Amino acid sequence: MYLSEIQNKDIVNLKDGKKIGNIVDIEIDNNGTIHSLIIQKNKFNIFKSSDIEIKWNQIKKIGEDVILVDNNI
């Protein structure tokens, strides 16, 4: 899987159905396995960094337009 394949998908929290944010980076381990997604929660606030980490095991479904995650944000 390439970052470009998932980068433009909406990240949606299964807990409340709300969009969390956009993928800005991924963390990969030494074996090349994706460890987590780095999500920019509030991209319009230039004064406050609000990146969050979504662990790969929190991802429940990757669809055509949406990635569903189980996260307590």
Task: Report the location of each language-model feature.
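Peripheral interaction segments used for macromolecular assembly
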Residues: 1-73
